[in-house]
Amino acid sequence: MPSNQELFERAQKTIPGGVNSPVRAFRSVGGTPRFIERAQGAYFWDAEGKRYIDYIGSWGPMIVGHVHPEVLEAVQRVLSKGFSFGAPTEAEIEIAEEICKLVPSMEQVRMVSSGTEATMSALRLARGFTDRSRIVKFEGCYHGHADSLLVKAGSGLLTFGNPTSAGVPVDIAKHTTVLEYNNVAALEEAFSAFGNEIASVIVEPVAGNMNLVRATPEFLGALRRLCSEYGSVLIFDEVMCGFRVALGGAQQLYGIRPDLTCLGKVIGGGMPAAAFGGRRDIMAHLAPLGGVYQAGTLSGNPIAVAAGLKTLQLIQAPGFYDALSRRTTRLVQDLTEAAREAKIPFTADSVGGMFGLYFSESVPASFAEISRCDVPRFNAFFHKMLDAGVYFAPSAYEAGFVSSAHDDATVEATIEAARGAFKSLA
């Protein structure tokens, strides 16, 4: 049986950095990444046979736990019929109907294979619909790795955005304006300065890639008002928070209706699937009806659709979200109490089945506030918990996830491990 370290060394010979997505490499926290052998319910096991309570859930999709028997059965039924057809299926219609029913702002929906495809396509559609080029995003929000979204703010409001990745041309980045999350005044100033140039504003209504940060109702309300006033397309990126924070997503929680919505993670049930959709008049601009091109060989893949459709059916069970939210709330409250007992500056927050852990005196409301958290102490806490068999996100800038498979005993085991970890850090 090879060790995690042996597998990591072997992986680095043929895979850049040894991983297929950077956060998996443990660069933020240090140490050796765990190579996963199998998973079940709220747990997974690494290559060395060690079991962990999993609070990543494949970064959100596993809301009903790993290898849920009904999801597994749905996938197995489809496998014998074919893996991929490159032609439409009835199942694609069924999942589209289910999504439109659960998220009323999505009058029509187009399936894709990843969150990046969803946001990239939604932005192209918004530009085609408005015949404008400028987009607005917010510091700390992650919308995938399309060139126009790997951009940070310039030195002032009216300056061009700057690329955050090598390989992103400045000529592309200059069309993206980056503002502070939850800053209504900056938003109003930007629209006043160049509102008639803005094709779209894209936002995570509950951010999860600068850790968990909630948008304020005032901020989202201002977004809706200004986009309507200036004819800009408001895009909610709910790839992470969609079906995670409520059955109808963050837009249900806040009572805000965006023009377009991007979904992913949960709608694939652990398989590669995502979607974007919204107002019928905007979606009519997509090929083959309109002039905005978008396509994908594996879009609406029957195996992914089967897993996603069954997951969407399971989360509609009576009391599902009440139980999920209650368990997540208990987790963050008990973690906060354990830190308080050890006199460690620490706070936590949760929305539905998402949560954030902050080594800080208060819950952050922006990327600047997140950046002031004690990252070295988080890293030490992460490794203490990992040693105790609890797997949190290997970065101080990522949210965590609870599933319906996390029962009271699982949460209690987590808290018991945390008490020891906090005491050792005091």
Swiss-Prot record:
Which GO biological process categories is it annotated with?
Answer: protoporphyrinogen IX biosynthetic process
Report the top EC class in one word.
isomerase
The GO terms this record gives for MF are: glutamate-1-semialdehyde 2,1-aminomutase activity; pyridoxal phosphate binding; transaminase activity
Catalyzes what?
(S)-4-amino-5-oxopentanoate = 5-aminolevulinate
List its EC numbers: 5.4.3.8
Q: Which PROSITE patterns match?
A: AA_TRANSFER_CLASS_3
Q: Which pathway does UniProt place it in?
A: Porphyrin-containing compound metabolism; protoporphyrin-IX biosynthesis; 5-aminolevulinate from L-glutamyl-tRNA(Glu): step 2/2
Q: Which UniProt keywords apply?
A: Cytoplasm, Isomerase, Porphyrin biosynthesis, Pyridoxal phosphate
* UniProt xrefs under NCBIfam families: hemL (TIGR00713), PRK00062.1 (NF000818)
Q: How does it assemble?
A: Homodimer.
Which protein is depicted? Glutamate-1-semialdehyde 2,1-aminomutase
Species: Paraburkholderia phymatum (strain DSM 17167 / CIP 108236 / LMG 21445 / STM815) (Burkholderia phymatum)
